[in-house]
Structures are given as structure tokens and as C-alpha cells.
């Protein structure tokens, strides 16, 4: 089990969730129930005859489900998990020269990097593959458990297992964790921020998402509502700048600057950009 820094859930409301499962997966469902309960989530186990697309369509409320591929988040006829194994083709194409994120975060120097806005962990997975030591921070107990499950599956994969020891999952509030790093003067080279809700461009127009990303984000938005509580955006930038000399912020290409702060440098791609803040 990954590290619990003690502050992961103290600002979250009480959570209750169903876990749907076929009878063959009852033991796994009970395991997830116990893990989530230890993180403040009350889980109701719901055995069903068949967990399929029809069942998901008929049960549109936000829930969890368990099958041979582990733990999933489901709603509105869709299901989603971080699924790190699906990222293998992308990783095999990646290199320090080809990836813009590698240049922005100086991954060739094998930095110690805090990803303070974990999401599905795909960027951290890429950065760990390219050599970084990653501290992946997430405070929502359900999303953290989904990430933990994806890492456990990755550790059993011949390709991914080669660098899983470079990813440390931390069940913590990112703001509190950055403050802790500042107080303890721990060595971190880079803080990486990819806020979940940068939905506006420089003209305050809504930014469109690709279909697959939109599908994943729809479910994450249901789990992490955009009410200011879960949007770990603007306030993290100032905290991060106190901790490290290099803060990298990922943004949609035409999005406004995080916290309205102009970066010192930018790397521009077709769909996104990386804004750098140096101290």
C-alpha cells in the first residue's frame, strides 16, 4: 500500500459509493471495500448477474465496479480507470528528444519531481519512464485508490514493472504536502501542475476536448466537481514556487495563464503548451 501523508481526506465531504461486481469477483470487491473504508469512503457492495454495457446504461449513477481488470469508475453508461497498461504504445514511442514535457521538466537530468495534480497519472507515467523520480500526490480517496490499483497492475507487467519503483503515490492534499516540503527543506527539483479545469482560452471561450479525453474527464468531473474545492489550480503555483526553482504548468494551447501569471518561458505544441516559472 502506498504512503498516507495524513491530510488526504480532511477537507473532503463524507463519501458513499456502490461497488458493482459479479459473484466471481466478490473477494476483490471486499478488498476494495476495506481499502476505501480505511480512507473515509463508505462502500455498499452490490453483487449483480452480469456487469456489461447494458447494465451500465441502466445504472447511470456514479459508482465503482470490479471485474477481471480491477477497479473502475462508472457513470452514464461509461466506465473508466487510469489503465496505465494502455499507455505502453505511447511510452515505447517516447524519448527525451521527442517529448516536449521532457525538455520542459529537464528529464534528462533525472529530477525528483512532484506531480501535484495527479489526474490519471499518465504524464507521471511518461516522466518516470524517461527517468524522473516521481512523487504523485492525490487527496481524493477514490481517485487515489484507482491510481493505486493501476500501479499494482503495472507492477505485474513485464514492461511497466521496470520503472514502477520511480513512482511513489502519496495520499495527501497537494497544498499541505508542498507546505511540508517547504518547512522540511526536502530536495525536490521540479513541481509539475496540470490543473483539471483549465476550460477557458485567452478570450474566455470554452476549450474543446478530444473525444476520448472528454469521456475520461466527464467521469472525473462527476467525481471531482468543479466547485473550487477540488480544482487544484491557481493557489498551488505560489506554493510550488516557494519549494523549487522550476515549476512547470501544462495548459491547453490557448488557455489563460495559471493564476494570471506570465511564465518565464514556454514550450508550444499543437494542442497544449508547457509554461515554466523559474526562481
Swiss-Prot record:
Keywords: Cytoplasm, Methyltransferase, rRNA processing, S-adenosyl-L-methionine, Transferase. Its EC number is 2.1.1.242. GO terms for cellular component: cytoplasm. The keyword S-adenosyl-L-methionine applies. It is found in: Cytoplasm. Specifically methylates the guanosine in position 1516 of 16S rRNA. This is Ribosomal RNA small subunit methyltransferase J. It comes from Acinetobacter baumannii (strain ACICU). The lineage of its organism: Bacteria, Pseudomonadati, Pseudomonadota, Gammaproteobacteria, Moraxellales.
Amino acid at each position: 500500500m502506498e504512503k498516507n501523508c495524513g491530510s488526504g481526506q480532511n477537507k473532503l465531504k463524507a463519501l458513499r459509493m456502490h461497488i458493482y461486481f459479479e459473484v466471481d469477483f466478490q473477494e476483490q470487491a471486499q478488498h476494495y471495500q476495506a481499502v476505501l473504508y480505511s480512507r473515509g469512503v463508505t462502500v455498499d457492495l452490490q453483487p449483480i448477474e452480469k456487469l456489461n454495457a447494458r447494465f451500465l446504461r441502466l445504472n447511470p449513477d456514479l459508482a465503482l465496479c470490479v471485474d477481471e481488470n480491477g477497479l473502475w469508475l462508472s457513470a452514464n453508461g461509461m466506465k473508466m480507470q487510469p489503465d496505465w497498461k494502455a499507455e505502453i504504445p505511447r511510452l515505447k514511442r517516447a524519448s527525451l528528444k521527442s517529448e516536449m514535457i521532457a525538455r520542459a521538466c529537464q528529464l534528462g537530468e533525472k529530477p525528483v519531481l512532484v506531480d501535484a495534480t495527479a489526474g490519471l497519472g499518465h504524464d507521471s507515467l511518461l516522466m518516470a519512464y524517461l527517468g524522473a523520480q516521481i512523487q504523485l500526490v492525490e487527496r481524493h480517496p477514490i481517485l487515489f485508490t484507482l491510481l493505486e490499483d493501476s500501479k499494482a497492475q503495472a507492477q505485474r507487467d513485464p514492461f511497466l514493472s521496470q520503472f514502477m519503483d520511480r513512482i511513489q503515490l502519496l495520499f495527501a492534499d497537494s497544498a499541505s504536502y508542498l507546505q511540508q516540503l517547504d518547512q522540511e527543506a526536502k530536495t525536490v527539483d521540479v513541481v509539475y501542475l496540470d490543473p483539471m479545469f483549465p476550460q477557458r482560452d485567452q478570450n474566455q471561450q470554452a476549450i474543446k476536448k478530444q473525444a476520448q479525453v472528454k469521456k475520461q474527464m466527464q467521469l472525473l468531473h462527476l467525481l471531482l466537481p468543479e466547485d473550487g474545492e477540488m480544482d487544484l489550480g491557481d493557489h498551488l503555483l505560489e506554493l510550488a514556487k516557494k519549494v523549487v526553482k522550476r515549476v512547470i504548468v501544462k495548459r491547453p494551447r490557448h488557455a489563460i495563464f495559471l493564476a494570471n501569471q506570465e511564465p518565464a518561458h514556454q514550450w508550444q505544441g499543437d494542442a497544449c503548451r508547457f509554461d515554466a516559472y523559474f526562481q
